[in-house]
């Protein structure tokens, strides 16, 4: 019996290294200009990153309670640790801050079921949540009844106030902006003209002017002895201002839909509101998810303008802490911390927007 010996060729070496070299050559050194730009970026990172790491981590001061404890040449993160409560809660009484934490916990727990795919009556649940949860938050934070000590809104501040203004602003501006977008495309001249006037007026006025008018000028036109809380006036101004931008974003989605969608709804004998609610708006809102999230991110960052009317959000609380004589010279650490918080929230919203785009396949336009 003859034995046949089969010789197997050696396995080819891994192509990972060669693929990496091809990618580097194609994307970083494909031309002289690209090579110079790559080398310049490498040099810039070499010059900036090591000193930054040295300042932020290696030579940073982490332990202590006063400015005198910051003896190293790096960042004084002791300042952030000692003023963290002010950055998060503003001037809210220290012994009452558990109320804010409880409101946040209730919000997180109650929002979680909205992401369940098997949640029955999802629409009713969201509608009930939108009505009940703000009342719970107001009761917990403001108090004044049911054995809770009253805490005036002038004591609210920090990241808490930033989140309140941003969330209430977009929650109020979204439905109002949708109505304005529908009104601007209405066949009724009066409705269309009024919608156009409202949108163009608020789009032509800076937000800082709106806040100033709501806080300083509005009380001059009110009856003597009548007063409205400063935070309420600011929230109303933010909602009116932001609704104009939401309206234009939604109008872009409405214009992107082909006429066939309207004709299909008419063939089913659907009325105007059923057509908009069941056929048009779901598709239009799906198309403008990036624009809506961009508007939300812009509003979140614009909350820092409330300092003009004496409200101290996150950024204003950091500024207030840096002028404290006990912590002079800590402005860099404070602004870096504030920038990091803003970046975390804005980046998270941006990533969630990308998730929604992929989930709803916003790249496809209905035919």
From Swiss-Prot:
CDD domains: TM_PBP2. GO terms for cellular component: ATP-binding cassette (ABC) transporter complex, substrate-binding subunit-containing; membrane; plasma membrane. Residues 159-353 form the ABC transmembrane type-1 domain. One of its GO terms (molecular function) is transmembrane transporter activity. It is found in: Cell inner membrane. It holds the Pfam family BPD_transp_1. The chain crosses the membrane at residues 37-57, 100-120, 126-146, 163-183, 193-213, 234-254, 292-312, 327-347. Keywords: Amino-acid transport, Cell inner membrane, Cell membrane, Membrane, Transmembrane, Transmembrane helix, Transport. One of its GO terms (biological process) is peptide transport. It comes from the Bacteria. It is a multi-pass membrane protein. Its main location: membrane. Residues 1-36, 121-125, 184-192, 255-291, 348-367 are cytoplasmic. Residues 58-99, 147-162, 214-233, 313-326 are periplasmic. Belongs to the binding-protein-dependent transport system permease family. HisMQ subfamily. Probably part of the binding-protein-dependent transport system YdhWXYZ for an amino acid; probably responsible for the translocation of the substrate across the membrane. This is Inner membrane amino-acid ABC transporter permease protein YhdY. The gene is yhdY.
